[in-house]
Amino acid sequence: MSALFISDLHLCEQRPVTLRAFFAFLQGPARSVQALYILGDLFEYWAGDDDATPLDNAVSDALAALAETGTSLFFLPGNRDFLLGESFARRARLRILPDPTLIDFDNEGVLLSHGDILCTDDEHYQSFRRLVRDPAWQLAFLERPLAQRKQVIEGLRFQSETAKQEKASDIMDVNAFAVETLLREHGYPTLIHGHTHRPAHHVHVVDGRSCERWVLADWHDDAPYLRWDGAGPPVALRFGAKLGT
């Protein structure tokens, strides 16, 4: 099996270079593998599937075109786009996964997550996450007028950016105990996640067993991704955005 893993693109009109990189990526590296896994924060924010902007439509069309070539598409929601639903998924021809999701990758267990569930030192954020991930809360929120939803989201984004300036850097990273607990609960797999914007390859020894953890990079003026072919180990690569190479 061959697959690419990406996260934290934060697509929006204000980031045209990232948009160009993403569309080029879908026409390039993504067509050379069997599966593409998008592990959250594909969009800068998502107010609901009824907010069909030209950008959103262009992204869904590009993903659907990739699916037409035979690449299977999977999306695991992030903290910015957890309201993305089945309507968009149908248009984009992708499957939405729960967080976390354990997959069988050539007879090896691989655990996928956006990664924010591991940042347990940030107790304020975890309380907020539990609230907004509750299905009842989401249903009530999506029943509000679109303009009101977008206003609320803009306010939350401002609060989030302000709070980041006041938080210690370490509480916004993953908690080692949370990582080890998750690995133990899922049979000591390889873990792939994003969210922290701290790309790295870690090895955790849990109950005497070595478990790899790959942290995906966020996108700026290039397009970082993790490629994994069944015959070898994962490889972190970058697809040049500005040059399209």
UniProtKB/Swiss-Prot annotation:
Chain residues that bind substrate: N79, R80, D122, S160, K164, K167, H195
Residues binding Mn(2+) 2, per UniProt: D41, N79, H114, H195
Superkingdom in the source lineage: Bacteria
Entry annotated with the keyword Transcription regulation: no
NCBIfam families attached to this UniProt entry: lipid_A_lpxH, PRK05340.1
Entry's family note: Belongs to the LpxH family.
Catalytic reactions on record: UDP-2-N,3-O-bis[(3R)-3-hydroxytetradecanoyl]-alpha-D-glucosamine + H2O = 2-N,3-O-bis[(3R)-3-hydroxytetradecanoyl]-alpha-D-glucosaminyl 1-phosphate + UMP + 2 H(+)
Protein name: UDP-2,3-diacylglucosamine hydrolase
Molecular-function GO terms, alphabetical: manganese ion binding; UDP-2,3-diacylglucosamine hydrolase activity
Pathway where this protein functions: Glycolipid biosynthesis; lipid IV(A) biosynthesis; lipid IV(A) from (3R)-3-hydroxytetradecanoyl-[acyl-carrier-protein] and UDP-N-acetyl-alpha-D-glucosamine: step 4/6
Subcellular location as annotated: Cell inner membrane
Record note on cofactor: Binds 2 Mn(2+) ions per subunit in a binuclear metal center.
Keywords recorded for this protein, A-Z: Cell inner membrane, Cell membrane, Hydrolase, Lipid A biosynthesis, Lipid biosynthesis, Lipid metabolism, Manganese, Membrane, Metal-binding
Gene symbol of the encoding locus: lpxH
UniProt membrane topology term: Peripheral membrane protein
InterPro entries from the UniProt entry: Calcineurin-like_PHP_ApaH (IPR004843), LpxH-like (IPR043461), Metallo-depent_PP-like (IPR029052), UDP-diacylglucosamine_Hdrlase (IPR010138)
Organism: Aromatoleum aromaticum (strain DSM 19018 / LMG 30748 / EbN1)
UniProt: Mn(2+) 1 binding residues: D8, H10, D41, H197
Pfam families in the cross-refs: Metallophos
EC number: 3.6.1.54
GO annotation, cellular component aspect: cytoplasm; extrinsic component of plasma membrane
Record has Hydrolase as a keyword: yes
